[in-house]
Amino acid sequence: MADFSPRFLACLPFVLKEEGGYSNTPGDHGGATNFGIIQAEYNSFRHFAGLPVQSVKLITKDEYRAIYWASYWNPHCPDLSPGLDLSFFNIAVNGGPVRAVKILQQVVGVSVDGEPHLNDVGAAAWSSVMYTSLIAYGAPF
């Protein structure tokens, strides 16, 4: 298993509180979901790990933590300040990492393309302006 960072482990309970457990709501384009992980993503994870496909309803703590770490935390959150990392992580799990980047770009007022350009806005913008803007946007901390 991955060697998770202290910040990831500190933020994880907040995201899990939002994500809850298993759901398969009619009309939800993601279909069957458990801990915010859709069936297709779980299938890919298990295939890559050399494991047989099974229902996302059976996902283990080790599996969802590994998916959160690799797909939602590690690509961008280590570069963000505390608080902002949690908000970004939560948005990424709820709507995908590209959507999370677009929301951050939108609130800062830079070109919205879904590709993170931290140097475009500078560390101060990502840590203070975005933190304040995300609070106004209604993002949880």
Give each language-model segment a name.
Residues 1-141:
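Cell-wall polysaccharide-cleaving catalytic domain and substrate-binding groove, primarily
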